[in-house]
Design a protein with these regions (language model features):
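Active/ligand-binding-proximal structured segments within catalytic/core domains
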Residues: 1-10, 202, 212-225, 234-237
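Acidic/histidine-enriched segments that form metal/cofactor-coordinating
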Residues: 5-133, 282, 297-316
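Buried hydrophobic packing residues in well-ordered domains
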Residues: 10, 28, 48, 82, ...
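A structural supersecondary motif
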Residues: 16, 201-205, 225-267
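Histidine-acidic residue clusters that define the catalytic metal-binding segment
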Residues: 38, 99-143, 175-179, 208-210, ...
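Non-catalytic, conformational "gating/processing" segments within enzyme and secreted inhibitor domains
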Residues: 67, 73-74, 79, 127-163, ...
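An aromatic/glycine/proline-enriched structural segment found at the starts
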Residues: 107, 115, 120, 139-209, ...
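C-terminal regions of mature proteins
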Residues: 144-147, 291, 295-372
């Protein structure tokens, strides 16, 4: 099919078509309107399979390789779109802080790289290299097809088996990434940027995504520490501070196949750098010193239950949840164990997990300050 046929045909049926990529996966999805379980669903499967198994990737859409410092390139194609996105993201202060932190959290693992790539690579990669990557990794063993909705299961399974015929394509080579261990000393990375305020990020390596109970425990800790205006960081660093030091203070937990990331971050006044670092560090250490309360634990559990329920409200969310557990955790049964594990977690469990993963000596601290 010609470029654009897939999108135009399905969008004419009322479908939403998109794709996304992250550290462990890329996913392509089609969401059809209710009532499209018959021929429209069959058409979507046919076109989706055609796109996944036999992409054309025309040279004229990718664009010819070019030198980055050549101002005469006027034929802007897909590679130029990606490069512009890289440049836009690179100018964002939080992206700078995160990239510096992430790069120094890993010694060898590919997670240290930026997912979107670099302008140097994107400007030079050839169509042959892209097709070779596709032929190597878009294989039966590496792909999961998920269909959620109200349809005849047996008929749709038969349709998927028919359309997704890889015609003997070999499976992708098994990749065994060397798992990095946390640093045994605090690493501080400092940089300058065009900003009026300063940015701070503490980064910690966590458990693998399929270590379900520890992951839920870190989700709970993230909520207690810094995920809302009632969190410890917001209350202690913003709401109750006698002088304004912080504009933002929060915590986030990202889950990855080979090991998660836990971030504690803040945006603060440049002249208060030492004080800001000390206060954020104190909040992390106080997860042990100032014991988590039953009230904090129950409130966080309630919030996680709501998220879990919300993830089952639409076909898109159900599909994404199944895809995550199939691809990143490699164990669909973990969905069934989730709420049971959540209910079993105690304050003592949280203390053990905090001591194990949120030790300041294992942190990478990234700081971005204004240029003088």
């Amino acid at each position: 099919h010609k470029a654009g046929y897939f999108d135009k045909t399905l969008e004419a049926k009322g479908a939403i078509v998109n794709a996304a990529t992250w550290k462990d996966y890329t996913f392509y999805y089609v969401t059809l309107p209710k009532g499209a379980e018959g021929k429209d669903l069959n058409l979507a499967i046919e076109l989706h399979a055609d796109m996944m198994l036999d992409p054309v990737l025309p040279e004229e859409e990718i664009g010819a390789p070019f030198e980055l410092d050549n101002p005469e390139v006027t034929d802007k194609r897909e590679r130029h779109v990606v490069i512009e996105e890289i440049r836009m993201r690179k100018d964002q202060n939080w992206t700078k802080v995160y990239n510096a932190c992430n790069f120094n959290m890993y010694k060898k693992h590919p997670y240290k790289r930026d997912v979107i790539g670099t302008p140097e690579i994107i400007s030079q990669v050839t169509r042959d290299e892209i097709m070779n990557y596709y032929q190597t990794y878009y294989s039966p063993e590496n792909m999961t097809t998920i269909i959620v909705g109200d349809f005849d299961k047996e008929k749709i399974l038969a349709k998927v088996e028919k359309e997704f015929d890889f015609k003997g394509r070999p499976n992708a080579p098994k990749k065994f990434n060397e798992i990095d261990t946390p640093t045994d000393h605090t690493i501080v990375v400092e940089s300058k940027g065009q900003t009026n305020t300063s940015y701070l990020m503490f980064g910690f390596l966590g458990p693998k995504a399929n270590q379900l109970k520890e992951n839920i425990e870190l989700d709970i800790v993230s909520i207690i520490l810094g995920e809302s205006t009632s969190s410890r960081m917001y209350q202690n660093l913003i709401e109750k501070q006698p002088e304004q030091i912080f504009m933002l203070a929060n915590a986030e937990h990202y889950q990855f196949k080979d090991g998660n990331n836990f971030f504690v971050q803040a945006n603060f006044k440049p002249e208060k750098k030492e004080k800001a670092i000390e206060l954020v560090k104190k909040e992390i250490e106080n997860l042990i010193n100032n014991q988590i309360t039953e009230e904090e634990l129950e409130k966080a559990k309630k919030k996680i239950k709501s998220r879990f329920a919300y993830a089952a409200e639409t076909v898109s969310e159900i599909g994404e949840t199944i895809g995550y557990y199939m691809t990143v955790c490699e164990d669909l049964k973990l969905i069934e164990e989730y709420l049971k594990d959540l209910e079993s977690i105690t304050i003592k469990d949280l203390e053990t997990t905090v001591k194990k993963y949120l030790n300041i000596n294992n942190a990478v601290i990234s700081i971005l300050e204004p240029e003088k």
